Amino acid sequence: MSRTVFCARLNKEADGLDFQLYPGELGKRIFDNISKEAWGQWQHKQTMLINEKKLNMMDPEHRKLLETEMVNFLFEGKEVHIEGYTPPSK
């Protein structure tokens, strides 16, 4: 049976992550407060950020930037701004 959490990003009860995906205290906070759906949204944004800003995950400054964007997106409700990206029209 899947576990449910009150998702801080979506502001609703939703399926929680199956296991802690990120290390440390931040990882515990994500595991306890972020749903699978919100994590999937973050993964999509993260991929766009890495590609568009040409981030190198071996660079500690790039990892810190990505972590800051992740916290802003998941817990503070801020959207990720990707310069030059225009979402497809529906």
Swiss-Prot record:
Membrane-spanning ranges: none
Keyword Heme (UniProt): no
Cellular compartments per GO CC: cytosol
Keywords annotated in UniProt: Iron
Annotated S-S bridges: none
One Pfam family, short name: Iron_traffic
MF term (GO), any: iron ion binding
Functional summary from the UniProt entry: Could be a mediator in iron transactions between iron acquisition and iron-requiring processes, such as synthesis and/or repair of Fe-S clusters in biosynthetic enzymes.
Family according to the record: Belongs to the Fe(2+)-trafficking protein family.
Record's protein name: Probable Fe(2+)-trafficking protein
